[in-house]
Amino acid sequence: MTNGFTRLTEQFLIHIGVERGLATATVTAYESDIAKYIDWLETRGIHEPDAITKQDVEDYIAALDQAGESARSKARRLASIHEFHRFALGQHAVTADVSAAVKAPKGASTLPDVLTVDEVTRLLDAAAVGGSTDPVVLRDKALLEFMYATGCRVSEATGANLDDIDLDEHIARLMGKGSKQRLVPLGSYACRAITAYLNAGRGELEQRSSAKIPERRALFLNKRGKRISRQSVWEIVKATGERAGITKPLHPHTLRHSFATHLIQGGADVRTVQELLGHASVTTTQIYTHVSPETLIETYLTSHPRAR
């Protein structure tokens, strides 16, 4: 990466990470997208931001298409490029945002992986297998109940602190993207699981820490008494899913998708679900308003005058 791009990229990453307060994982994704974009530009002999044209941006997206990138991946990369060019314009590194008129490629909307209510029940039941007095089992059960009850992102679960939970009021405070806080209800199942973990699990995990100053704030601790990591949550979800016999692709975000879908199917208003999820735009939430094939068939059979 040449000097013309290097300084601008560094400033951009500081802007989104510090000034806008985006999560570390989000900043890393932006960094990767922009680095690949600039590498491609430099293969075309473009080494300064103000040398980029609209055609270059369009050609890059076309190159991604030829490389077999999915529509979702291309749309995400273009969104990163849009942010980068807008920032460059604001910094007077360019005289125009040449990416502004470049539209995201159209593609089939892919619905997120969602568990049925029965599958969620099996997953949460499987988390309790292994003994109710084992602190790790108590933690896993509390963690998964918390994630399904709140629909939180994995970063919000790992970042949760003890003082973010009010078990008497059944409320949790989540720190979302851009350091935006929101309050979400905690159901009775989650409250019972968290209470059991706090009473008989967390203290023992905290004592396992070799640190001079124990982890006093974090809600969920790992086996060594430190704040639990994103990777650990992934491993817990995967292992618990295997014990539950769930064959669908399973990751922490699956619980968030399932939370939203089950609320919509239960009659919740999409605007309410938007607030619970912490989405900035209702458009993002509307993917959960999809109708299941079973519901479509049932509605058709009961509504169409010549269905039967």
Curated annotation (Swiss-Prot):
Origin: domain of life: Bacteria
Transmembrane segments: none
Catalytic residue positions: R153, K177, H253, R256, H279, Y288 (o-(3'-phospho-dna)-tyrosine intermediate)
Compartments, record wording: Cytoplasm
Any one GO cellular component localisation term in the record: cytoplasm
Key words of the record: Cell cycle, Cell division, Chromosome partition, Cytoplasm, DNA integration, DNA recombination, DNA-binding
Family matches, as PROSITE patterns: CB (PS51900), TYR_RECOMBINASE (PS51898)
One GO BP: chromosome segregation
GO MF terms, alphabetically ordered: DNA binding; tyrosine-based site-specific recombinase activity
SUPFAM superfamilies named in the record: DNA breaking-rejoining enzymes
Main location: cytoplasm
Quaternary structure (record): Forms a cyclic heterotetrameric complex composed of two molecules of XerC and two molecules of XerD.
Main function: Site-specific tyrosine recombinase, which acts by catalyzing the cutting and rejoining of the recombining DNA molecules. The XerC-XerD complex is essential to convert dimers of the bacterial chromosome into monomers to permit their segregation at cell division. It also contributes to the segregational stability of plasmids.
Identification of the protein by name: Tyrosine recombinase XerD
Species annotation: Bifidobacterium longum (strain NCC 2705)
